[in-house]
Regions:
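Domain-scale detector for complete catalytic domains at protein termini or as standalone homologs
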Residues: 1-75, 82-249
Length: 249
């Protein structure tokens, strides 16, 4: 392989860079993991949260453009999939190199995903939604301090994704790989492939749909197989290994 690859990972609503921390141990030295940390969480807790897709993508592009000195791929989960798609277009608009591949996990294509108004609902409704999707333990939601902290981030991000209306854009030119859990309640088991396949209209290159056992957060128990799949698509010569990981400011 001629140069090192960077895997840029964008989290789900309420998530942050640490969601991908465990991936570092599965990556070979040829791949650098760059976890995106949205403002208002972890060591960016003092930074104001952003509840607009346009402003978030602008801020991410500002941080990432100086770092794009080689081939890279974008991986987004749930809300992060839409952020990754918008980010690819914003980077192209700035004349930056485009991603080698885009991995869209756990979300229908922009413009086809079902939106709602959960960000306007009470805390109990938001907690019920988090339990429905999985990925958040009952113990965390039962702790008043942790619950308040998490719901603040979740409500902000739900406002972002529920008010997001993608503009009509030309297709990307990189392959799009769609990954999803076979029982993901966000997509619906009976129509999961049809909804995931909507990404095919957003690129001139090929699109692949890959399903895994599990629900919306399938990629936690299926972490090893997900990472192996990503590596094979990035470069067939890559195998799992391990290294440390940085994250964006």
């Amino acid at each position: 392989m001629a140069s090192r690859l960077t895997l840029i990972c964008l989290p789900h609503a309420g998530g942050s860079a640490s969601f991908y921390r465990s991936w570092a141990a599965l990556l070979p030295p040829e791949v650098e993991l760059l976890g995106v940390r949205y403002p208002g969480r972890e060591d960016r807790f003092e930074d104001p949260m952003i509840d607009s897709m346009g402003r978030l993508v602008t801020a991410l592009a500002d941080a990432l453009v100086p770092l794009l000195d080689g081939p890279y791929a974008l991986f987004g989960h749930s809300m992060g999939s839409a952020v990754a798609w918008e980010l690819a277009h914003e980077l192209d608009h700035r004349g930056a190199p485009g991603p080698r591949r885009l991995f869209a996990s756990g979300r229908a294509a922009p413009g086809t995903a079902v939106t709602g108004e959960l960000h306007r609902q009470g805390d109990d409704t938001l907690c019920a939604e988090l339990q429905r999707l999985g990925g958040t333990s009952r113990e965390v939601l039962d702790d008043p301090g942790l619950r308040s902290l998490i719901l603040g981030m979740v409500r902000n991000d739900y406002r972002l994704i529920e008010t997001y209306r993608p503009a009509h854009r030309p297709p990307l030119h990189c392959p799009i790989h769609v990954l999803t859990g076979i029982t993901d309640p966000e997509l619906g088991e009976e129509r999961i492939r049809d909804r995931a396949a909507g990404w095919a209209d957003l690129t001139t290159a090929r699109t692949e749909v890959r399903t895994f056992p599990g629900d919306h957060f399938y990629l936690t128990p299926q972490r090893r197989e997900v990472v192996a799949t990503v590596l094979r698509r990035m470069d067939p010569s890559l195998t799992t290994g391990g290294r440390t990981w940085p994250s964006t400011p």
